[in-house]
């Protein structure tokens, strides 16, 4: 395995996931699943805070999820790969495929701007760039819930969503419209000046805590989301996984999770078929079909936040309900549950129910001792998973 970065380097802060990913990991590799569980943080409930001219309003969603630092996840997966005999070579950027030793299969997991994918037009790559600038930061404000915070400024609305990543540190993704970005001068300010301005704008939401621009990698920079699709995920003996194959908007919170599932499905297909091309054909057919609705939801979510000013003028409860509908239709009782969730006693009851659910799922997993892969030597088929990670509700 060639990794273009040095050991322990990562760009970004935290990743989020849900019980379905733990289920998949425990079925396929309980050792790494236990490590991921041990190094993750549980967050419960979601808050939507709106700071407008009328003061602060807060609305609530139920639900829970997990998060961990990106560096911790990479460490778990890299150490597990080494245990399984994988030759991991760090600091090795692949610029020319002809320089690689001959192989039956090349798996390209080099991100949305994949250089390997770019060497062939056969993938039919299409990249659409979103409108809103965003920046991926950290903060020493230790959020316990998943928090959306919207702030009215003289140049328009700016907002972040934040979640705990590791003890004492949270991930904080700031987004705004191009008009607000230019109006606040974020397009011309230096990196440090821009971060200090964001700290001042969000001083209430951050409770005076600081924003952190630099993780183990380079300082954070403003960017626009690249929505990547491909007509096919394989060509010859090269196959795409993760963001090289597909991207999902960060407001959906599923990119890392989907990349891991890609790898598992690819491994299953390779184990199922003797012929590599047959395996790649099945992987491509199943995963592209499963990701089609996910990417559609991603585009819808991205577009919703690009037009957030059409909704944010409502009271916080109505605004949060509109946010929860951005992925598409909901159950008929969704609105009633949303209204009930604004009551503290109902939120307490929902947390108690969620605690019971987590206990049940942990018991069912059983630490992976009787997983199918150990009994049969084959990976359990992961097809048919619910691929969309919906935080809201």
List each language-model region with its residue ranges.
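Glycine-rich FAD pyrophosphate-binding loop
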Residues: 1-11
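Conserved N-terminal helical subregion
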Residues: 19-136, 344-364
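Acidic/histidine metal-binding catalytic segments
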Residues: 35-39, 202-218, 276-282, 291-295
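A structural signal for short hydrophobic beta-strand segments in well-ordered beta-sheet cores
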Residues: 48, 97, 162-163, 233
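Conserved FAD-binding catalytic core of PHBH/FMO-like flavoproteins
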Residues: 79, 102-225, 229
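Conserved mid-domain beta->alpha element of the FAD-binding
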Residues: 107-108, 219-300, 304-306
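C-terminal helical "tail/cap" subdomain of flavin- and related membrane-associated enzymes
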Residues: 268-385
